[in-house]
Every structure is written in structure tokens, then in C-alpha cells.
Regions:
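A broadly conserved detector of short glycine/acidic/proline-rich loop/turn motifs that flank catalytic sites
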Residues: 89-91, 99, 236-238, 256-257, ...
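N-terminal beta-alpha lobe that positions the nucleotide/phosphoryl donor
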Residues: 9-233, 242
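Single conserved hydrophobic/aromatic residue that forms the stacking wall/gate
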Residues: 1-12, 265, 269-271
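ATP-dependent carboxylate/acyl-activation modules
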Residues: 132, 201, 242-248, 252-270
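Glycine-rich, charged/polar anion/phosphate-binding loops
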Residues: 218-220, 233-237, 246-252
């Protein structure tokens, strides 16, 4: 595990993966980057061999989370000012959509209540909670997406809603409760309420996704070696669904289609 600020993308993309190395470089040159850290590809390769975290890795993750708390002024799992993070894969070679991501880690029944107090926006909070419940259950607990998708579609149809934006705070709260019930039925246990356990299980899931069939098939097609491994990027959450004045997206500094035609290397000049 290596914090972004200590590294440069010129020398460490094999260790930090493409995302981690670029975040490190952006931090180095002073671009505002949400606080976080990267678990190296070496840790992934070790986990693939032994099915266990490398010795000392988890202690380093705990220390890095403490530093992230210090930088943000928030506390992971805190009932007053909770820190929420994402857990994303990031290999040296881009493999779009082939590996796993979990967002909004750190939410539970306690931190949801504190987030509502902090934001005064219960609709937003229950929306991001249902996203965690669905995504974590699918990626980490390996519960089929259909259980969550079908329930939401049926509920929206019963209410006469055409799009998700018509859902109210009470609607999303109901969906959260139903999603937690699905977890009990399909997984046999309650959804993990401990944020530290959430991030540990999400990290394992990202490591496992490197050797998943979808990722292996993609690497075979693109001639990417299995030995690269994937890094894991733990980053403070930035929300694109907070309200009408928030959004997320991708920005290119040049036309990606025309650039691709003159050489792949030049595609790397992008935001």
C-alpha cells in the first residue's frame, strides 16, 4: 500500500496501476485530488497465490485510512461526521468494465442517520445507501443483480414512476429496507454494518476480480499478461447525484476517436 503523494506516474504505473499512478501524478503537480491511497499490484498478485493479504498489508491500510481521515476531517464509521470511500480496481493496462468497483463504503444504519443530519437531504442519502446495498451485495456477496433490479422495477411500476428521479426519500428508504431483506434471504446473514469489514471484503472482491473469467478473457483478447495484477484505489467519495447542481463525467483534452487513429500513446493525454 502506497499513498498517492509519495509516487510519480513516470516510475510506478506497474505498482499503482493506471488510475493510481495518474492520481499520484495529479497530486504531485498540485491538482486537487480527493484524499485516498492505493494498494499495490504486488499485493494483488500475492493474494492470487495465497488467498490471503500479504503480511503487514492490512495494518498499512488501517494506517492509510487514518491519514485519509486526518486529511478530510472525517471519521470512518463515525456517528457524527462519517467518511465514505470508494474501492476501485486499476491495472496498468486499461480494462474498462472488466473488474469490480464498490461505492459509498462506510454507510450503515448509523452513518445514514448522521449523513441525513449533515446534508439535510434524506433522498440523496437513501439513494446512495441503496446503491451500496446493491453494489456490495452483487460484487462482494455475489448475490445476483436480478434480485435488486427486479424489485426496483416492480416498485417503480406500481408507483407509476418512469425514471429514478421521481423516487422520493421515503421511496428510497423502503427500497433500502427491502434490499437488506434480500441480503438476509440470499446470503443468510445481515448486510455488514461494520465499515472496516466492508472495506476489507471489498478489497478482497477487487483482488478476486482480477482472476475472474471476464477479466481473463479480456486479457487473452488484448494480450495483457496475468502477472500485472490490479491495484486497489481507496478514495474519498465525490457525489454526482447530490442534487441538480452536481454531476460526474469524463473529460477529454482532444478528440478520442481521431487521436486513437494516430496512435494509442497519444490517447494518454486526457483528463
Amino acid at each position: 500500500e502506497i499513498t498517492w503523494r509519495d509516487w510519480s506516474s513516470d516510475v510506478c504505473s506497474s505498482d499503482l496501476g493506471g488510475k493510481g499512478a495518474n492520481l499520484a501524478e495529479m497530486t504531485r503537480i498540485g491538482v486537487p485530488v480527493p484524499a485516498g491511497f492505493t494498494i499495490t499490484t504486488e499485493a494483488c498478485n500475492e493474494y492470487s497465490k495465497t488467498k490471503e493479504f500479504p503480511a503487514g498489508m492490512w495494518d498499512q491500510v488501517v494506517a492509510a485510512m487514518a491519514e485519509t481521515e486526518k486529511q478530510t476531517g472525517k471519521k470512518f464509521g463515525d456517528s457524527e461526521n462519517p467518511l465514505l470511500v470508494s474501492c476501485r480496481s486499476g491495472a496498468k493496462e486499461s480494462m474498462p468494465g472488466m473488474m469490480d468497483t464498490v461505492l459509498n463504503i462506510g454507510l450503515n444504519d448509523v452513518t445514514v442517520a448522521s449523513m441525513i443530519k449533515l446534508t439535510n437531504n434524506p433522498r440523496f442519502v437513501y439513494d446512495i445507501y441503496r446503491r451500496l446495498l446493491h453494489m456490495f451485495s452483487s460484487v462482494v456477496l455475489e448475490i445476483a443483480d436480478e434480485h435488486f433490479e427486479n424489485l426496483l422495477l416492480q416498485y417503480e411500476a406500481e408507483k407509476g414512476y418512469k425514471v429514478d428521479t421521481e423516487m422520493t426519500a421515503e421511496d428510497w428508504k423502503f427500497i433500502c429496507d427491502e434490499y437488506k431483506h434480500i441480503v438476509i434471504l440470499q446470503y443468510g446473514k445481515e448486510f455488514p454494518q461494520d465499515p472496516v469489514e466492508q472495506i476489507r471484503l471489498a478489497t478482497i472482491a477487487v483482488f478476486k476480480s482480477w482472476m475472474g473469467k471476464r477479466a481473463i478473457d479480456y486479457r487473452r483478447a488484448e494480450n495483457i499478461p496475468d502477472s500485472l495484477g490490479t491495484a486497489v484505489n481507496i478514495c474519498t467519495m465525490v457525489f454526482g447525484n447530490y442534487g441538480d447542481d452536481s454531476a460526474t463525467g469524463v473529460a477529454f483534452t482532444r478528440d478520442p476517436i481521431k487521436t486513437w487513429q494516430i496512435g494509442r500513446a497519444s490517447c494518454r493525454e486526457r483528463v
